[in-house]
Structure formats: C-alpha cells, structure tokens
C-alpha cells in the first residue's frame, strides 16, 4: 500500500513501518524503492523476524482461493509509536493500518489518530485475526476487504450475489454494525461500497487484459486512501482505487506505475 501511495508524485508521505531483517533482500529492496521516491523512511526498524511470508494459491481467474502465512514480529512498531508517535501523527495527512496487527499497536494507532484528528483507513491480511479486532472498525474512517473476508466479518455467505445485491446487503450490515465506511472488492466485478449514512453503490472494474493480479488489492487500497484523504467522495475514491488496480493487473509488476495526481482527478499540481 505504501509503495502504491508513493507512486503519486508530490503527495507528502510519512510512514512508520517495521520491515524484515537487515540481511533479507526483499525488505531492503522495499526500503530502497521508498527512498528513491523520497518517502520518509526514518522510522523504519530492521529487526529479526520483522518480515513474514505469505503463500497464495490462485484460480484460473486470478483470484486467491487459498493462502497460508507466517506472521512477522510486529511489536517493534509499538515501540516506534511510543517514542515517535506524536511526531509522526502530527505531520501525517492520514493513516493506513492492518487491523489484524497486535491489539496494542492498533489501540495506540487509533489513540494517536484521535489525538491529532487524523483519518485512519483499515485493511486486513488475516480476517480470522481481524475478527478479534471487530470493535475497532467503528473507529476507522473506512475499512477495505474482499467479499470472502466480508463474509467472515458478518458471518454471512455472499456467494452468488450480484454486485448490486451485495451493495444492498452491505449497506444494511454497515448501518447495523456502525462501521463508518466499508468497501468490499469483488474481483473482476470491481468493488461495492456503503457508509453509515446510507450511501451505497457499485464501482465497476476497468476492462483490461489480466496478466497477474498480485498487488491489485494493495494498489486499490492505496488509491482509496489517497482519494478519501484529499476530499473525494467514497465513490470517487473507489474509482481511483480501481484505476490503480487496473494498472497493476495488466503487467507482471505488483506495484502500480507512477501517475500524476490530476490523472486521477486530484487537484494537485506537480512542479516540473
């Protein structure tokens, strides 16, 4: 998600992240990429077992049908928040967090965001753990998950529903659960969205040739977070997300290419 955000030039970016061991190439490569795009990496800590692993199984349509993961040790992030949280949050525009992180990290993040009046956007890697954080969803500005994860969240089978039908059901669930905004991605059908005020709808996916769906969800989340941060409506933010997701699945790269803000409908000029 961070890499997706940094592909939009001239947006101020500050991140507090714990990434893997210093000798592990993937973690170091991510840091180098962020630094190359002038992302502030001062708060990154390289620690043993700081980078987990994830194995995913995809079907012929490019959708994840099974996965297994080894969670990293994320507790160093809590230490970062305790020491530097005020400095980070006071300068941030908004926050993106995985809600299935350690409960103490989520609580500290939400407390700091409330203190400085910052929006917090939530994503999830393991919904089985995310369910244990369900109460926190009411404190998020928006939460993003896929239809399978939404089924776990609401203990409901959403398979067989059209996007329009799913939007109606999700709207009802969101109001009942008092979740401010919820976006549910539905693969090749795009995404559905709903908020507590009754706004709901479907944002179709862009018609493109699929090569590899890896990273599409992260890019969608990046686009959604950027859109909402810069004052776009929920539908408009979803459209930015689908734009970035489409740019990922047409290549073998797992991160979207660089876009100028105005290409995505953001009223921000970039200096030549």
List each language-model region with its residue ranges:
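Conserved phosphate-binding/catalytic region of the ribokinase-like
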Residues: 129, 156-272
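Conserved N-terminal subdomain of the carbohydrate kinase-like
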Residues: 2-94, 262-272
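Short, hinge-like loop/turn segments at secondary-structure boundaries
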Residues: 32-36, 59-63, 137-141, 160-163, ...
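Conserved beta-alpha-beta core of the PfkB/ribokinase-like small-molecule kinase fold
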Residues: 92-169, 189-191
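Glycine-centered short loops/turns at secondary-structure junctions
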Residues: 9-12, 38, 117, 178, ...
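Hydrophobic/aromatic residues located in beta-strands of well-ordered beta-sheets
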Residues: 13-15, 120, 182
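Structural alpha-helical scaffold elements that stabilize or flank donor/cofactor-binding regions
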Residues: 87-88, 135-136, 175
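Short, acidic/turn-prone active-site loops that include or flank metal/cofactor-
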Residues: 70-74, 124-127, 148-150, 206-208
